[in-house]
C-alpha cells in the first residue's frame, strides 16, 4: 500500500527448509512475489529460492555480509594507547574471548606452566556472561596467578599474568591488543562457538 521496497538480504535457505516451503508452495510463492530483491549468501541458496518461485530477475548472490566488518577506529586508537601505557609492546597477549564455564579453567590449566615459565605472556580473560565475572575471578585466584580486573580500573602491570576483562562493550579493544585469540563456546557440548570474524578482521590468529 505504501510502496515501500521489500528486500531479503543475506538470505540463507537449507535444503531441508526448502523442502518444507515447497509443501506450502502457494503460500511461499505469494510471499516471494512480494519481494523486490533477494540477495542470497551463495549459489545453492539462490537456486533453492528460484525453485520455489522467486524471480531470477530480482535475485542475485551477494555473499555473507557477516564478512563485511571492520574494527571501529576508536578501539584501535585506544588499544594503541593502552599498549603504550601498559608496556605491552614486548609482551605476548593471549585473549580468551566469550568463554563459558568451564572453558576458562581448562585453558588456564593448560596455560599455567607457560605463564610461570614465561613472564612476558599475559592472558586476557573475557567471560561471555557478566554474572560470572566474580566466579571467574575467584577461579583465576585459585590458580595462584597474578590477576587484575578491568572493573577496578586496574592496569596490566609487569607482573600481571591474567587480566580479567570484566567490562561490557570493549571486545574490539581486547581483540586489538591480542597476538593470539581463542573464541569460546567451542569446548563445551553441543559446542559451535561464537563469532570468530571480529578478531580475524584485525588479523589476529584465532582458534
Write out the residue ranges for each language-model feature.
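Acidic donor-binding loop of glycosyltransferase active sites
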Residues: 158-191
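Structural loop-to-beta junction motif characteristic of Rossmann-like glycosyltransferase folds
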Residues: 4-5, 180, 185, 198-207
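Active-site and donor-binding regions of nucleotide-sugar-utilizing enzymes
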Residues: 1-61, 65-69, 74, 100, ...
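Conserved catalytic-core segment of nucleotide-activated headgroup transferases in glycan assembly
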Residues: 71-153
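Residue-level signal for inorganic ion chemistry
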Residues: 38, 64, 107, 182, ...
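Redox-cofactor binding/interface segments in oxidoreductases and associated redox assembly factors
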Residues: 40, 96, 183
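Short active-site oxyanion
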Residues: 33-37, 93, 121-123, 161, ...
Amino acid at each position: 500500500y505504501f510502496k515501500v521496497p521489500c528486500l531479503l538480504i543475506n538470505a540463507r535457505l537449507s535444503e531441508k527448509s526448502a523442502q518444507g516451503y515447497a509443501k506450502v508452495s502457494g503460500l511461499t510463492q505469494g510471499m516471494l512475489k512480494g519481494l523486490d530483491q533477494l540477495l542470497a549468501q551463495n549459489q545453492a541458496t539462490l537456486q533453492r529460492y528460484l525453485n520455489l518461485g522467486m524471480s531470477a530477475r530480482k535475485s542475485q548472490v551477494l555473499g555473507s555480509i557477516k564478512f563485511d566488518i571492520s574494527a571501529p577506529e576508536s578501539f584501535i586508537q585506544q588499544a594503541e594507547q593502552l599498549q603504550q601505557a601498559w608496556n605491552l609492546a614486548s609482551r605476548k597477549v593471549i585473549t580468551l574471548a566469550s568463554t563459558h564455564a568451564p572453558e576458562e579453567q581448562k585453558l588456564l590449566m593448560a596455560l599455567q606452566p607457560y605463564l610461570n615459565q614465561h613472564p612476558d605472556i599475559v592472558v586476557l580473560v573475557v567471560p561471555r556472561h557478566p554474572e560470572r565475572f566474580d566466579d571467574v575471578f575467584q577461579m583465576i585466584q585459585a590458580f595462584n596467578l597474578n590477576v587484575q580486573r578491568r572493573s577496578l580500573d586496574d592496569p596490566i602491570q609487569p607482573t600481571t599474568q591474567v587480566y580479567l576483562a570484566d567490562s561490557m562493550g570493549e571486545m574490539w579493544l581486547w581483540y586489538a591488543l591480542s597476538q593470539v585469540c581463542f573464541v569460546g563456546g567451542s569446548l563445551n557440548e553441543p559446542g559451535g562457538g561464537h563469532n570468530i570474524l571480529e578478531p580475524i578482521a584485525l588479523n589476529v590468529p584465532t582458534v
